[in-house]
Amino acid sequence: MHKNAPFKYGKFPNAQCYNITPNENNNGYHIGVIFVIVKDNEIVAWADFKGTTYDVNPVPFTYYNIMDLAYDYNWFNHDTLAHIEGVGFDISYSSYSLCPMSRAHGKDASYLSIRKRVNFKRSTEYVGGLFVKDNKITRISYPLSVSQKDVDVDLDLTENNINRIASVYFDIDEKIVVCGYELPPEEKAEAIEVELEISVDDQIFNAFMNRG
């Protein structure tokens, strides 16, 4: 699987494009090549070698979701699919994703849901969530089935903080796939992490110890 230039066709201009080619030479735009269209780390469509696009229900850009789509649309046989690898990039094997609870809100979504893929099936289960305002995480939310109060925090919305919270509060040992939501630019996020590294750890730990 190879990363291509941004897709220029259909209703997803400038979305990231990856091609899955059935041979080892990556011949480019030949008959049989499949293009996976990704926007904000979600698979939103796929295209054939003619550039014809086919919308899909948005799902996190992970190896297992690529497998699901390949089975759905009969792209390749099982043996070929089982050996798909990222060339020049890493495919995520995580079972966990963080996405806006309501897609109608887009980038202004105030609630992001942590979900876990169940038994490598299309279904997912709710694990918890984050309330977000102005790119700040303001509250960590638990499922109603868990006898645990929500926890108020004041943390920058960065990939690093998201994964720290997932580890401390939800015992998740996999990297969270953030999709459907645009995080602050990486340069800014890195600067924030360096500046607040100690205070963020203290805040997460203290809030965790004081939960009730």
UniProtKB/Swiss-Prot annotation:
Keyword Nucleotidyltransferase on entry: no
Result when mutating R164 to H/S: Confers resistance to host DarTG defense system
Highest taxon in the source lineage: Viruses
Coiled-coil region(s): none
Keyword field: Host-virus interaction, Inhibition of host innate immune response by virus, Viral immunoevasion
GO biological process, one term: symbiont-mediated suppression of host innate immune response
Cysteine pairings via disulfide bonds: none
Family of this protein: Belongs to the Anti-DarT factor A family.
Known role: Plays a role in counteracting the host DarT defense system, when mutated at Arg-164.
UniProt-recorded name of the protein: Anti-DarT factor A
Organism of this sequence: Escherichia phage RB69 (Bacteriophage RB69)
